[in-house]
UniProtKB/Swiss-Prot annotation:
GO terms for molecular function: identical protein binding; ornithine aminotransferase activity; pyridoxal phosphate binding. Disulfide bonds join C154-C163. One of its GO terms (biological process) is L-proline biosynthetic process. Its EC number is 2.6.1.13. It catalyses: a 2-oxocarboxylate + L-ornithine = L-glutamate 5-semialdehyde + an L-alpha-amino acid; L-ornithine + 2-oxoglutarate = L-glutamate 5-semialdehyde + L-glutamate. This is Ornithine aminotransferase. The disulfide bond between Cys-154 and Cys-163 is reduced by TRX1 which increases OAT catalytic activity.
Length: 414
């Protein structure tokens, strides 16, 4: 392209993006050009371990050849036809997803935010038509410090100032309770107008907050007791990230509704899904909800192959096998660190929380980049450690060395 011939250096690309793009993100100053497996490469061909994985979108690894081939083959035949017509691919995808996860129905969308918006509508509709809540009185309970997206509905359910400041007025009837607090939850669920409780099995954007072992079983029991839909937002935790196909499987509970996204496409295409049984899903009738791109043939074919890769390559098992030793290794090597507050995680959804009164966490991210590993901070105090699930023990050991070396560099200042 003639008009981009002036773009040669990383600074050129960064300045070009800052000049022509909206400033709704604040990226780490690295310009990525290509990726494969657990690695990404910048415009100078420097290689980095990817420890953000596009917020757990590339669980299967970057540019997986099987997913890529499925994408190309489907694109040669039919990419989109809208839901005005049936397609070969969609029904196959729906059958695969529902059989795999044990639900009657799935509603396909594009993004995690759309999956959550779908859940809001589904809970309300069920509340009015099944639970018989009075008109316009349905209430949804969520957890403080949750993250579900940045649409108006999602930020109405949020307590994060950066997402909510100067964007009001918000959608009504969202009640916020502390995460991992069954007593506070029960007080809210006693309200007969509550139709749903939406919860992340592990709070990702909050800094990888892992609940106590009795929390999700307690949530399940309380929702049954008060006739409230239990909705698990597995957009980030699902599809192997925590060592199980769904994070809720660690706790042997089955939510009424499950939300999926991100790794549903292996990072190749925006795909999300909402799963529920007929008694819940069929309250939505034709024309009441949908998306032009939701469930398109291209997305459906990519989704099927992404799930095939996850299962055939035993990526859930790999995350389960490597996650514990990875965390324990970090804790052992960094037990004397003066700047670390906590090291925590589940499977390969891990994080280090730093004492941000002592150290600038963004500086740690920049030093990690310099040492060959990229990730991003959360709320100026926590660094996420979420590699693709195809990572090997040898690669993870090398990454542990990079992380330990980087932390000790900052520790030496104290």
């Amino acid at each position: 392209m003639e008009f981009v011939k002036d773009l040669k250096t990383p600074e050129d690309y960064i300045n070009n993006e800052l000049k022509y793009g909206a400033h709704n993100y604040d990226p780490i100053p690295v310009v990525l050009k290509r990726a494969k497996g657990v690695f990404v490469y910048d415009v100078n061909d420097k290689r980095y371990y990817d420890f953000l994985s596009a917020y757990s979108s590339v669980n299967q690894g970057h540019c997986h050849p099987d997913i890529l081939n499925a994408m190309i083959n489907q694109a040669k035949n039919l990419t989109i036809c809208s839901r005005a017509f049936f397609s070969v691919s969609l029904g196959i995808c729906e059958r695969y997803l529902t059989n795999l996860l044990g639900y009657d129905k799935v509603l396909m969308m594009n993004t995690g935010a759309e999956a959550n918006e779908t859940a809001y509508k589904l809970c309300r509709k069920w509340g009015y038509e099944v639970k018989k809540i009075p008109e316009n009185m349905a209430k949804i309970v969520v957890c403080k410090n949750n993250f579900s997206g940045r649409t108006l509905g999602c930020i109405s359910a949020s307590t994060t100032n950066k997402c909510t400041s100067n964007f009001g007025p918000f959608a009504p009837q969202f009640s916020k309770v502390p995460y991992n607090d069954l007593e506070a939850l029960e007080e809210e669920l006693k309200d007969p107008n509550v139709c749903g409780f939406i919860v992340e099995p592990v709070q990702g954007e909050a800094g990888v907050i892992v609940p106590s072992d009795n929390y999700l079983p307690g949530v399940y029991n309380l929702c049954k007791k008060y006739n409230v839909l239990f909705v698990a937002d597995e957009v980030q935790t699902g599809l192997g990230r925590t060592g199980k196909l769904l994070c809720v499987h660690h706790y042997n509970v089955k939510p009424d509704v499950v939300l999926l996204g991100k790794a549903l496409s292996g990072g190749h295409y925006p795909i999300s899904a909402v799963l529920a049984n007929d008694s819940v899903m069929l309250v939505i009738k034709p024309g009441e909800h949908g998306s032009t791109y939701g469930g398109n043939p291209l997305a459906a074919s990519i989704c099927v192959e992404s799930l095939n890769v996850l299962i055939n390559e035993k990526l859930c098992e790999n995350a389960d096998k490597l996650g514990g030793p990875f965390l324990e290794g970090l804790k052992k090597e960094l037990k004397d660190s003066k700047i670390i507050r906590d090291i925590r995680g589940k499977g390969l959804l891990c994080a280090i929380e730093f004492k941000n009164e002592l150290v600038n966490v963004l500086d740690i991210c920049l030093k990690l980049k310099e040492n060959g590993l990229i990730t991003r901070d959360v709320h100026d105090k926590t660094i996420r450690l979420t590699p693709p699930l195809c990572i090997t023990k040898e690669q993870l050991d090398e990454c542990t060395e990079i992380i330990v070396k980087t932390v000790k560099f900052f520790d030496e200042k104290f």
